[in-house]
Amino acid sequence: MSQAEMSTCSMPHTQRVFQEAVRNGNTKELHSLLQNMTNCEFNVNSFGPEGQTALHQSVIDGNLELVKLLVKFGADIRLANRDGWSALHIAAYGGHQDIVLYLITKAKYSSSSR
């Protein structure tokens, strides 16, 4: 691991920066952060103070681009939030048809590859 990667990994505010990028819908910043965190002990599926993962928040916001990015970097589409809702439930309830279709496709693909 390079010195730059080690310093990124040891930043105490990494989780806050990650969640802030998600809340702001900043795909470019989030992509950069996730790329730099690939060699770290960083959990893309961690829950924020509202009981949501970054994926849940991106679905709530209707941000398909961010949803795709998070899934690419390992976000678990089957995780439930503190209310028991998966990303698919949230997308359907919010009327985000593009995200619903994407999540169904990903779920179908991931279950057939097991």
Swiss-Prot record:
Annotated family: Belongs to the NRARP family.
PANTHER family named among the record's database cross-references: MYOSIN BINDING SUBUNIT, ISOFORM O (PTHR24179:SF21), PROTEIN PHOSPHATASE 1 REGULATORY SUBUNIT 12 (PTHR24179)
Function of the molecule: Promotes loss of intracellular domain (ICD) of Notch1 in embryos. By down-regulating ICD levels, could function as a negative feedback regulator of Notch signaling that attenuates ICD-mediated transcription. Involved in angiogenesis. May be involved in somitogenesis.
Protein name: Notch-regulated ankyrin repeat-containing protein
Record carries keyword Repeat: yes
Pfam families associated with the record: Ank_2
Gene Ontology terms for molecular function: enzyme inhibitor activity; phosphatase regulator activity
Induction, as annotated: By Notch signaling via a CBF1/Su(H)/Lag-1 (CSL)-dependent pathway.
Superkingdom, natural source: Eukaryota
Quaternary data: Forms a ternary complex with the intracellular domain (ICD) of notch1 and rbpj/suh.
Biological process annotations from GO: Notch signaling pathway
